Amino acid sequence: MGSALKIGIAGLGTVGAGVVKILRSHSRLITSRSGKSVELKAISARSRSKDRGVSLEGLSWESDIIELAGRSDIDVFVELIGGDGNPAKEAIETALKSGKHVITANKALLAKHGQELAELAEKNNVSLKFEAAVAGGIPAVKALTESLAGNKINRIMGVMNGTCNYILTRMETSNLPYETVFNEAQKLGYLEADPTLDTGGIDAGHKLAILSSIAFGTQIDFKAVVTQGIELVSIQDIEQAREMGYRIKLLGVSQMTDEGLEQRMQPCLVSANSPIGQLENAMNMIIFDGDHSGQIILRGAGAGEGPTSSAVMSDIIDIARGNKIPTFGQSANSLIKMKPVLTSTPAAYYIRTKLEDSPGVLAKMATALGNNGISIDQMRQTQHADVAAPVVIVTHKTLPETLNKALIEIMKTDVTLEAPVALRIEDV
């Protein structure tokens, strides 16, 4: 058995404390499975006195994470402080330049700087690993870089933000409006400090960008991910979707087309009987479609102390075993800079708006759609007691750019009393 692998951890929040607990409680198990002992050597966090529910006795404390990253007595630097810039970025760069392996759960940083950090890791012949950055305890990164390495990936699809899935599930099961469930989720601590990272689809978009890079051999480009949040989803949308046999999910889809790499994260209607449609509460699900493997479905908790710290430990054990895999599954220099493209796959759409309750208004809306070559599959008008008539239209398949032109034309008419909300109906 070789010499101990020495670890330094920056960040002792929920995940960092969870990693310390696993290292303390499972030391013999880790040694037997990795072939060498793993020793937690040094730590760093904002508060030294805070009770984290685990003993920190015997550990060296660094008040400066940059100093921790450069210490000569650690082999692996674990970054768990977050943020898409410094000090996390500087600390990771310091560790890599010092010849240390790096493990991070920082999806925002990877989505923004992943390419340059991967190149730096390769230059210094060390590993940059991030299983915990995508979907918590689900081994999505390992599935792509290892288990499916012999496959051409046709499509990635999934629910990658548990908070949004919780909100949408709660709205449906409790018949509560978005604002009420949002406030409830905030009180439960489900939301990021900036809630729009969750509800705006940004957090999930970061994860999709990372997986896309691995699956399609491309440089990470988060700006190319079309993101739309769940803020405009109403209880009426939830009810209408249910009546038609659908559920609404914040759905990520990435696929290579003839035009380029298509990446989108947006609320969609999916079949209630599909695996994604049956996903409840704060769970995540990621589906990889490989040309030989077929459809691989991974489901599990996407956040929380246990699942995320488990993912960090997976990376630690990989390093202890000497497993060396390029950061994004292949040499960073071989990753292609792809032209981003808008969605080129046609789909049916759900449209909800309010129209003036007067003769001829539905005909005007149908004309605006027809002028753009969009046919109507069904139209629903709910009962109302005021001058505004709530209307739901489901179209036949069309391209999003065509739909957008039609929506602009609809808005220019004198019959709409609110901006239409359009949700894609995705075949899953």
Walk through the language-model features, giving the residues of each.
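N-terminal glycine-/serine-/threonine-rich beta1-alpha1-beta2 phosphate-ribose binding loop
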Residues: 1-98
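General beta-strand structural signal in soluble alpha/beta enzymes
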Residues: 61-62, 78, 103-105, 128-132, ...
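Rossmann-fold NAD(P)-binding glycine/threonine-rich loop
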Residues: 83-98, 107-145
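Rossmann-like NAD(P)H-binding beta-loop-alpha module
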Residues: 122-203, 210
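Substrate-binding/catalytic subdomain of NAD(P)-dependent oxidoreductase enzymes
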Residues: 180-278, 283-285
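Glycine-rich phosphate/pyrophosphate-binding beta-alpha loops
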Residues: 294-296, 300-306
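A conserved regulatory-domain signal marking ACT and ACT-like small-molecule sensing domains
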Residues: 311, 316-428
